[in-house]
Amino acid sequence: HTYRVAELCELITRDLKLDEYETDVAWLTGMLHDVGRFEQIKRYNTFNDAQSVDHANFGADLLFKEGLIDTYVDGFHDDKYGVIVENAIRNHSAFRIDERLDEYTVMFCNILRDADKVDIFRVNVDTPAEDIYNVTTEELKNSQVSPEVMAAFDERHAVLRSCKKTAVDHVAGHIALTFELVYPISLQIAKERGYLDKMMAFESDNEVTGKQFEEIRAKLNEYVASVRPL
């Protein structure tokens, strides 16, 4: 995941025609964005932020408060771009980016957030949902999408973790991340690699859920076609 996110950061920056140093900085945010995960599993034996710590802030603290960044890049701790990397990592999994950040820093945050989301789509396609969400096949195939989650497709935004109540809410919630992609190239990559179609092809044994996914497919396809023309 780390290497793929770094690669996607580079692809996005090149599409934005940023310079080589900016591209390297964006690549570095991808390489370091989940550094908190390693210490999280070591200390708490879980990747679940709700049961341990926010891995994004934890990783940023390890790198920039405890000095771990110095093992990766010399003299980067107090550098202008060091601050940008710290903020990008700190905000990469937040529901919304810190509003106090300047526009230039927000750009790097968005590059990393887009790259992370696109590879999360890949993980959802390549890995059994039962393993990702720690649910049984029966729960996944028989549960319904909660009203709050369905509302996100009407309102075109991501789903708060607290709104996900059922097993299938997690599937729909990850699909809804599409609404948060900032750069057209990010959506183009996700579409061309087949991630969106494969996620939306989820099949349920519950008739109500089947109809809900028909609605999800219609609304997401409409969004992709009209809001983010490829």
Language-model segments: what does each one mean?
Residues 3, 7, 11-23, 32, ...:
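Divalent metal-dependent phosphate-bond-processing catalytic cores, especially two-metal-ion Mg2+/Mn2+ enzymes
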Residues 1, 24-27, 55, 59, ...:
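Catalytic-loop motifs flanking and including active-site residues across diverse enzymes
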Residues 44-54, 73-77:
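Short coil/turn segments at secondary-structure boundaries
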Residues 4-12, 53-68:
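An active-site-proximal "capping" alpha-helix that borders the catalytic cofactor pocket
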Residues 23-48, 59, 63, 81, ...:
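His-Asp-centered metal-binding catalytic motifs of divalent-metal-dependent phosphohydrolases/nucleases
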Residues 17-28, 69-90, 105-111:
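Acidic/histidine metal-binding catalytic segments
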Residues 41, 71-73, 188:
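Short, solvent-exposed secondary-structure capping/transition elements
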